[in-house]
Amino acid sequence: MVILEANKIRKSYGNKLNKQEVLKGIDIHIEKGEFVSIMGASGSGKTTLLNVLSSIDQVSHGTIHINGNDMTAMKEKQLAEFRKQHLGFIFQDYNLLDTLTVKENILLPLSITKLSKKEANRKFEEVAKELGIYELRDKYPNEISGGQKQRTSAGRAFIHDPSIIFADEPTGALDSKSASDLLNKLSQLNQKRNATIIMVTHDPVAASYCGRVIFIKDGQMYTQLNKGGQDRQTFFQDIMKTQGVLGGVQHEH
């Protein structure tokens, strides 16, 4: 089942005299339960693509459907409501509220629902245990490590069972052990919950945890790789080869 369908996506910035086209007619279809990575050199348009797919930014041309809903036809208020209810986000810099505990941060998306406190607590316990942060529930963000903050952020993204989770460089600020911990957890949640995850990354190791990698070059889809039955190490080598052809991806700032 296709959960996200984007057709002929274009995105420009600036005015008629000084127009910069960042996305140049991209088509993307994402199936429910896929873990997909978007890669590309700095300035290729991959973050812009994530922003328009998740409705944080608007397209200049083209259509985006999520669960059959035409995102490009919605007003800003409808979009904000849709994002809150149906989408989850994991950002590079965590975006946690410092005055709330780990548990309170994770429960935030449920505060706008009509769930009972008992049901909310059950959902919290389930996702926090899956992410290995249940013991940290009463701690504040300044009392935990970067990896634990990012897993808290992931808990907040997953708790309301969103249609799609968008992750923008989720391992960008983490050391390699914390990064692999997070990616293992995301991979497990993807399989256990049949969760759909779309992740922008410049790290081939991170991308190797996905089932499919889409490469963007100069605002267009360059190619894509499917993991298929390969192990992660083999897939990683394939990603590295494609990156080498693309050039400049490893040295992103």
Swiss-Prot record:
SUPFAM superfamilies: P-loop containing nucleoside triphosphate hydrolases. Keywords: Antibiotic resistance, ATP-binding, Nucleotide-binding, Transport. GO terms for cellular component: plasma membrane. Induction: Expression is induced by bacitracin, via the two-component regulatory system BceS/BceR. ATP binds at G40, A41, S42, G43, S44, G45, K46, T47. PROSITE patterns: ABC_TRANSPORTER_2. Residues 4-243 form the ABC transporter domain. GO terms for molecular function: ATP binding; ATP hydrolysis activity; transmembrane transporter activity. GO terms for biological process: response to antibiotic; transmembrane transport. Belongs to the ABC transporter superfamily. The complex is composed of two ATP-binding proteins (BceA) and two transmembrane proteins (BceB). Part of the ABC transporter complex BceAB (TC 3.A.1.123.5) involved in bacitracin export. Responsible for energy coupling to the transport system. PANTHER family: ALPHA-D-RIBOSE 1-METHYLPHOSPHONATE 5-TRIPHOSPHATE SYNTHASE SUBUNIT PHNL, LIPOPROTEIN-RELEASING SYSTEM ATP-BINDING PROTEIN LOLD. This is Bacitracin export ATP-binding protein BceA. The gene is bceA.
